[in-house]
């Protein structure tokens, strides 16, 4: 699909062979009751074609961005990458408005030549603030416990990253092939739906906060997005596909754009 077929960030993403299509379809359908509007995304980031691999055997690469906003959600965006056997990626993040006491929603679903790396969380804006975390965690932990029992553990979280994840961070590494495909369909997909539905329930219930509270939440959101932009694990892959200038503009101007948008 060429860029000119997607004139808006809300236009459907349809990339041949992209394995995470059902997840984006579920998310976009779940968001419709919130009356989403297109989020402004520059044309170069709506959909971009490239290649990887050798000159003798180039592999086509497509990267697309689906995005929207609502009255309570500043930015909802999904970065979609399909590069054949090299990579297939869904990176879906919901950034709430600081006028509402909400966490982030995050889903990283990554297929690489050595396996699937899969992560889901409702990530806290301020992990040290029980008024922010406890109403979420008491509803999220039962979902985590249900699905975590079905999956191998993904390994430890680096200490510097721990402030940005909840105790219900669902994180796994699973193999390619039939075993991985079965776990994705039986566990990861329903877990994604459960986490997202809880998040959207929280959004529906959220009431505006005071100006002082909004300032505190905005500060926490900026810390989170600055950390994510600095440590984005896709930086190396995207740089190989499209070069450093495009990649840095994408990371700072689209994926984690709060500093520019605030």
From Swiss-Prot:
Transmembrane segments: none
Family listed: Belongs to the HY2 family.
Name of the molecule in the record: Phycoerythrobilin:ferredoxin oxidoreductase
EC number(s) reported in the record: 1.3.7.3
Catalytic activity: (3Z)-phycoerythrobilin + oxidized 2[4Fe-4S]-[ferredoxin] = 15,16-dihydrobiliverdin + reduced 2[4Fe-4S]-[ferredoxin] + 2 H(+)
Summary of the function given for this chain in its UniProt record: Catalyzes the two-electron reduction of the C2 and C3(1) diene system of 15,16-dihydrobiliverdin.
Upper classification of the organism: Bacteria, Bacillati, Cyanobacteriota, Cyanophyceae, Synechococcales
Molecular function, one GO term: cobalt ion binding
One Pfam assignment: Fe_bilin_red
BP GO terms, sorted: phytochromobilin biosynthetic process
InterPro entries named in the record: Ferredoxin-dep_bilin_Rdtase, Phycoerythrobilin_Fdx_Rdtase
Keywords from the named record: Oxidoreductase
Keyword Acyltransferase appears in the UniProt entry: no
């Amino acid at each position: 699909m060429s860029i000119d077929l997607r004139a808006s960030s809300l236009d459907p993403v349809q990339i041949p062979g992209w394995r995470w299509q059902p997840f984006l379809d579920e998310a976009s359908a779940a968001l419709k009751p919130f009356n989403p509007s297109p989020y402004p995304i520059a044309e170069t980031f709506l959909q971009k074609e490239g290649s990887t691999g050798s000159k003798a055997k180039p592999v086509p690469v497509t990267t697309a961005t689906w995005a929207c906003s609502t009255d309570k959600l500043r930015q909802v965006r999904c970065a979609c990458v399909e590069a054949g056997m090299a990579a297939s990626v869904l990176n879906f993040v919901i950034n709430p408005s600081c006028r509402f006491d909400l966490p982030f929603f995050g889903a990283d679903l990554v297929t690489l030549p050595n396996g699937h790396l899969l992560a889901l969380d409702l990530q806290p804006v301020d992990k040290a603030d029980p008024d922010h975390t406890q109403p979420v965690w008491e509803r999220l932990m039962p979902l985590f416990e249900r699905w975590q029992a079905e999956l191998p553990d993904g390994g430890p979280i680096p200490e510097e990253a721990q402030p940005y994840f909840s105790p219900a961070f669902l994180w796994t590494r699973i193999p390619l092939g039939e075993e991985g495909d079965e776990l994705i369909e039986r566990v990861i997909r329903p877990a994604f739906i459960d986490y997202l539905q809880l998040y959207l329930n929280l959004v529906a219930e959220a009431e505006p906060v005071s100006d002082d509270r909004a300032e505190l939440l905005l500060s926490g959101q900026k810390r989170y997005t600055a950390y994510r932009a600095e440590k984005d694990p896709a930086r190396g892959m995207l740089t190989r596909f499209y070069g450093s200038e495009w990649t840095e503009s994408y990371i700072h101007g689209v994926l984690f754009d709060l500093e520019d948008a605030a």
